[in-house]
Amino acid sequence: MEYCLAAAALNGVDRRSLQRSARLGREVLERAKRRAVDWHSPERSRGNVGVLYRQGPYQERWSVPGSQRLLGEREERCPTLSSSFGAMAEFMDYTSSQCGKYYLSMPEEGGATHVYRYHRRKPPEMHMYSDTGHSQEQRNCRGETSVGQESIYQTSEHSQESSWPTENISKDLYIEVYPGTYSVTVGSSALSKKTHVVAVDPGQSVDLVFPV
């Protein structure tokens, strides 16, 4: 302390100001030592905010409402990889729903385009009729892009109704993906599914034809 005072005197700092700064610093340190957040407190405070109470003449604690219950639930549920990804999927689904609601409220055409492009969940159905007109077959035509265990489904923009035979009906799908290798599967049943593996480079456009 004396060394600091001597150095301060040489630098033109007032001795009284330096002592006052040291005293204030010690007071702040003592107050910080007396305060702590008690997450395991057996007492539960009322209301929605933490309550400051004194345990002793020189100690103060913050009681967080419901903290013991939350910690107990976390300890009971052992975190696993599946539960972690499940929680992430729930948050992403909620975020997506809120995003869709926001863009649905926009009067501009861009809002409807955004919702159609990113927030559609059910693929449109394509109705096809036989030549006799007595039987009706409904098929869900969807393009499936799979990477590992994850799949991204893209649907066509408009459903088509026609009395032509099945082999004369065509459907175009446009899918935007990041560069990489993808397995593309198309089909409405396990027997009719057809798969192509394609490698996409940056800026490359790949055309795939599936006879369905």
Curated annotation (Swiss-Prot):
One of its GO terms (cellular component) is nucleoplasm. Its main location: nucleus. It is found in: Nucleus. It comes from the Eukaryota. Keywords: Nucleus. InterPro entries: AKIP1. One of its GO terms (biological process) is regulation of non-canonical NF-kappaB signal transduction. Interacts with PRKACA and RELA. Enhances NF-kappa-B transcriptional activity by regulating the nuclear localization of the NF-kappa-B subunit RELA and promoting the phosphorylation of RELA by PRKACA. Regulates the effect of the cAMP-dependent protein kinase signaling pathway on the NF-kappa-B activation cascade. This is A-kinase-interacting protein 1. It comes from Mus musculus (Mouse). The gene is Akip1.
